[in-house]
Amino acid sequence: MKLLRLTILMACLLVPQLLIAQTSDSAQMDVAQGETTLVESGVEAAQPQVQSEIIKTGYNFGPLPAVAFDADKGLQLGAILNIYDFGDGSRYPNTRQNWYFEASFFTKGSQLFVVSYDNNFSIPSVRFCSTFTLTNDKAMDFYGFNGYMSYYDHAKVKAGKDKGNHEQFIYTPKYRVNRLAVLFKTDFIGNIWDNKFFWEAGYHLNYFKMGYKNQQALNYAKINKNKAEDKQFPSDPTAENYEKPIFDLYREWGIISDDEAWGGLTSSVRLGLLFDTRDKEAAPSRGIWAEAHLMLAPRWLGTTHPSYRYSVTFRQYVPIVKNDVLTFAYRLNYEGTFGDKAPYYILPYITTVGPNYDRDGMGGYRTIRGMMRDRVQGLDMASYNVELRWRFVKFQLWKQNIAFGLNIFSDGTMVTKNYDMSFRGSEESRAAYDEYMALSGNRTSDRPHITVGAGLRFIMNQNFIVAFEYGLPISRFSSDPFIKNQDGNGAFYINTGYLF
């Protein structure tokens, strides 16, 4: 049955794209062109290829159903439209401009809407990117702050999911919170030197609505809707099996202040520098992609809770076997905060400038594969991703360039500057706080969270990439009782693109 479901998912993802992805003009020729960079004057073509490949030109329309799976969000159902403008083909596999539209619904209660535009030609030597996203999570993961300093009661969660015990309460809402996030951004990237060194500047406007009616973490009526009575989450605080969500406990203990608890507006300017020598963007096989940027969100820009942060990321792609056959790739990232204060609701995000938009982290498909979503949050966080990518077959089908690839990987992260978790609540809550902190061994710092895994990818025209990956946290095998199973049991993903 699982094999049948996987086959149906693959068919829904791949067949529509193969049938519809036709361009206004395509030519078959030997690819032997120069290095690719970001802006128009530098974006030409990929590294030399020895085999004949179809060069895509004109417009390529890719409507397809959004059918995917994420262990953190559940089954994804929706629709996606990609529009690629390859121009005269001289940039292939990079585009002249492209549009991305998505409306997705997840079986665990999330909705995602995305409108994105990326332009490489309108402004000479400047790339222009603009994105609007709306994410509605009626039960978003929230495990607390500072990684292993916040204890995850995996044993009770496992017991609560025991379908054979109808008297056992379901425990997962303890680690959930309602969140609405609306993000808008416009970024510019311009050439400084030789189409390899660039400046970055952008404006980002983000709105976060946390919790339910400024009263509690969750809307229990919504998450219990259509559930059998014995499967409903306890919502009455006087019930014997009721468990107050961590979010509500953090408010009681003063870890999350009443001023910040229900979210706010973040209006920020981002400024940065970028160095990019990748041969192509969607699936690079050689080059360096490094950037550093500041996020400045002062009150005078309209920000509810001011913050000043920075991000440094270094990525490198090393060809072991040429022509995209075998590539070693890695990414190092550091997300930091100036000072000792930042609103808690911005901490999960891995910040970007350019065509991508901010992603939830650390934990999940786009950050640390195999670890629970948002498991690690702190004022400063360091992370790494290492991959070995093998493209084991290439061919042409229905005038499209097709390839399949395998990869093995390891991801890791840890908090390097703690979010303040000191007790600031009323004394009647002190005992519960002390008991909670003791569960993690009264730890005062985090340790590395590491995962390993492997995946398979379907690649079409170097840009459309479908990924099947499984990640496993090594904490499952730890002998330390304060570490074992704290990052989850592993996760399987069906999604698009490479992680980086």
What are these regions (language model features)?
Residues 29, 34-42, 131-133, 140-323:
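Transmembrane beta-strand segments of outer-membrane beta-barrel domains in Gram-negative
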Residues 47-59, 87-96, 122-128, 191-199, ...:
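Short loop/turn motifs that connect adjacent beta-strands in outer-membrane beta-barrel proteins
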Residues 59-61, 73-77, 95-97, 109-113, ...:
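Residues that define the transmembrane beta-barrel architecture of outer-membrane proteins
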Residues 90, 103-182, 333-362, 479-483:
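Outer-membrane beta-barrel translocator/channel fold
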Residues 259, 269-272, 280-398, 416-418, ...:
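C-terminal outer-membrane beta-barrel translocator/porin domains of Gram-negative envelope proteins
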Residues 458, 486-500:
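Outer-membrane beta-barrel "beta-signal"
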